Amino acid sequence: MAKRSSLYIRIVEGKNLPAKDITGSSDPYCIVKVDNEPIIRTATVWKTLCPFWGEEYQVHLPPTFHAVAFYVMDEDALSRDDVIGKVCLTRDTIASHPKGFSGWAHLTEVDPDEEVQGEIHLRLEVWPGARACRLRCSVLEARDLAPKDRNGTSDPFVRVRYKGRTRETSIVKKSCYPRWNETFEFELQEGAMEALCVEAWDWDLVSRNDFLGKVVIDVQRLRVVQQEEGWFRLQPDQSKSRRHDEGNLGSLQLEVRLRDETVLPSSYYQPLVHLLCHEVKLGMQGPGQLIPLIEETTSTECRQDVATNLLKLFLGQGLAKDFLDLLFQLELSRTSETNTLFRSNSLASKSMESFLKVAGMQYLHGVLGPIINKVFEEKKYVELDPSKVEVKDVGCSGLHRPQTEAEVLEQSAQTLRAHLGALLSALSRSVRACPAVVRATFRQLFRRVRERFPGAQHENVPFIAVTSFLCLRFFSPAIMSPKLFHLRERHADARTSRTLLLLAKAVQNVGNMDTPASRAKEAWMEPLQPTVRQGVAQLKDFITKLVDIEEKDELDLQRTLSLQAPPVKEGPLFIHRTKGKGPLMSSSFKKLYFSLTTEALSFAKTPSSKKSALIKLANIRAAEKVEEKSFGGSHVMQVIYTDDAGRPQTAYLQCKCVNELNQWLSALRKVSINNTGLLGSYHPGVFRGDKWSCCHQKEKTGQGCDKTRSRVTLQEWNDPLDHDLEAQLIYRHLLGVEAMLWERHRELSGGAEAGTVPTSPGKVPEDSLARLLRVLQDLREAHSSSPAGSPPSEPNCLLELQT
C-alpha cells in the first residue's frame, strides 16, 4: 500500500508585469519550485508585459511536500535574469480546493529572508539538575540549506537563543550540508513559558549575515516528552513586517490541482478490473449496463479524466480495442445524423483522444516531426487572408523592391501547398509504421460506421469518422500546438504560429473530405483547393490501407513493432566519470549520445556508433541532482550504480536546461523504481581530494548527507502504465457517483433499499451493477482497515514541538 500525490499545474498567462528592460518591456518566463527545488521552466515569451504560456505539467511527488512556488523571471542575454515576483501556494491552500485552485494571483516581491529551505538535525533533552532542570540542545547537522553566496554555497552557523541567552556554533565554510555536533545547555525555571529558538545563518565577512531559517521549540511540550531527536524543517521569520506590494508587480493566472491517492496492493483491485473487463468482452451481446452507466454518471468536467483512466486500464489488459469498439457501437446506436457523428465530447470521443495520445504519439512524431521542424527553421511569412497581409513584414532590403500583396498571397499559397503535400506524402508512406492496435481500432470504427450507415449516399461517412479522430483531434491540434504534443521544446513565435494555424486548417479541410460546408467558411483558403482535393484522394487511399488489417497481421505487426520498442529517453548529454583525485571542472565533460531503454543506459559518440558503453538498469541505485558549485555549472545530475564487480560508481551528466535535467531524472527514476538496493541517501557534491565537497565528510563510502528523491517525477506521454493507480482512480470516481448508481439499482431491482445487495444462495444471480456496488463496498472497507501509506518525513511529536 502506498500513498501517492500528484500535482497538476497549468501556467496560463501573466498580465500587467513591470518593465525590466530599457525598451519598456520584459522577456518573461516562469520557474516552478516544489519546496525550493526547481522542477519546471516555461518557455520565454519575448518583449511583452502580458505573456501567454498555456503550459501544462503533472508532477508526481511525495505526499509530504509543503509548498509550490511560481517565480516570474525576466530573461537577460548579457546579465543575470531579473526576478519579477512570485506566487506561493502551500499544500494546505491547494488541498482546501477539492476541484483545484484556479484564478489570478498577485505577484509578490521576493524577500531573501523568506527564501528558506532545508532541515536541521537536533537532539533536545530536559534533565534534572542540582538546583533546577536543565535544557540541553545538541546541534548535530543540517542539509539542503539555501546557497547565499555567489559560489553557490553558504558559510553556515547556528544561533541558539533561550531566555535572553544566546549561544553560537562554529562556522562551517562553503557548505550547504554542514556538520557541527555541538551541545548547549540552559537552565530551566519552573513555569517558564519562553520558547527555544534555533536559527541558522550564513556568515559574511563584509556584509550582514544572511538568514537561513529557524526552528522554534515549545519547551513546555518538551518537558512532557523529556527527550526528542530528529530533523526539523527550517521556517522563515514570520515576525518580519511584510511589504504590501500586491498588484504592483502584476498577476499570474494559474490552475493547480492536488490529487492524493492511497493505492492498495493489486489483489484488492482484481474484482473491479475483472468485472469491467467482463463487461467489455461481452460487448453489445451482454446486458451492457456498466460502461453506459459510467458514461451517464460522468459529468462533463471530469469526462476526460475518466476516459483516460478507463482507456489506460483496458490498454494494460489488452482490451483497449474492445473497449473503444463498445463505445463506438453505443454512440452509433443513438446517432441518426451523419454530420454529428463523434463531434460531441462523449466518452467515446474523449477515450479515443486519450488512446491516440497514449498509443500513437511516437507515430505522430514520425509523421509530423520533420514537417514541423522545417516550418520552425524556415520562419517564412505566410498569410492567405488579404485583410491580414502586412507587406512590410516581407519586404526585401537592398536593391529589391517590396513584394505586392498579390505576390505575398501567391508565395504563401506555394509554401502551404508544399508543406501540405509533404505531410500527405509522409502520411501515405506511414501505414506500416502505425501501431497495430491503432490500426485495428480504426478498422473496427470503419466497419461499425459502414454497418450503421450503408448505401452509396454514405460512402464517405466511414472515412470521415476515421479522419474526425486522426486529423481533427490528433494531427491538427499537434500542428497548432507542437509543444503540447512534445514535438518542440518551445512555443512558436507569432509568424510561425500563423503558418502552423493555416496548415492545420488545410489538414482539417482534407479531413472533412473537402465538403462544401468546409469550403464555404473561409473563401480565402481557395488557393489550396487543388492540393486539398488531391489530398482527399490520398487520404482515402491511406485509410483504406490502414484499416485493411486482419487478426493474424495485427499480431505479426504488433510483434515486429514491439521488437523495435523506442528508447524511453535519448539525446546528447555531457558526461564526466569520476577518476579519483584532482579538480573537477565543467570543461572536463565530454559530449556523448545517450539512450535509455528498459534494459540499460547506453552512451556512444554518435547515435549510429557501433561501439558503446552501458550501465545496466538493474545496477542503478539512485539518480539525483548535483550541487552547482561542484562543477562550476548548473543542470548536472549523477547516476549512482554498481559495476559488474559490485563496486559503487558514479557518472556525472550535464544537461542544457532545468527541463532536460528533470526529464532525464524522471525517466531514470521511473525505470529503476523497482530496483533492489536503491539508496535512501546520497552526496550532492563530489569527492574531491580527500573529502566530499558538500558536507566535508572524509569517508568516501560513508552515508550520504542528503535524502534521495526517487519519487519526484514528471509525467510524460511515454510513461509505463500503472494498472493499480488507474484502478484506484476509477474506484474513486465510481465512489463519487455511488448514490446515482444505487438509484439506478433501485430502478432495475424494483425499489430495493439502498445498500442491500442480495447475497443469499438460491436467489437470482447478481447483475453487473449489483456486483459493482459490492466491489465498491469491499474496496471502501479495505481502505478504511488498511494503515495510511508512507510515513511522514517528520514524526507528529516533532511537529507538535514546533510553534
UniProtKB/Swiss-Prot annotation:
Residue ranges of every copy of the Ras-GAP domain listed in the record: 318-546
Q: Which residues bind Ca(2+) 2?
A: D21, D74, D76, D82
Binding residues for Ca(2+) 1? D21, D27, D74, D76
Kindly list the positions annotated as binding Ca(2+) 5: D149, D202, D204, D210
Tell me the cofactor note.
Binds 3 Ca(2+) ions per C2 domain.
Alphabetical list of SMART domains matching this protein: BTK, C2, PH, RasGAP
Marked site, Arginine finger, at: R343
Q: Name one GO molecular function term.
A: phospholipid binding
Which regions span the lipid bilayer?
A: none
Location of the PH domain: 566-673
Its GO biological process annotations read: cellular response to calcium ion; intracellular signal transduction; negative regulation of GTPase activity; negative regulation of Ras protein signal transduction
Q: Which residues form the C2 domain?
A: 1-105, 116-232
What is this protein's function per UniProt? Answer: Ca(2+)-dependent Ras GTPase-activating protein, that switches off the Ras-MAPK pathway following a stimulus that elevates intracellular calcium. Functions as an adaptor for Cdc42 and Rac1 during FcR-mediated phagocytosis.
- Return the domain comment text from this UniProt entry: The PH domain does not bind phosphatidylinositol 4,5-bisphosphate or phosphatidylinositol 3,4,5-trisphosphate. This lack of binding activity is due to Leu-592, compared to Arg found in other family members.
- This one is known as Ras GTPase-activating protein 4
- Organism of origin is Homo sapiens (Human)
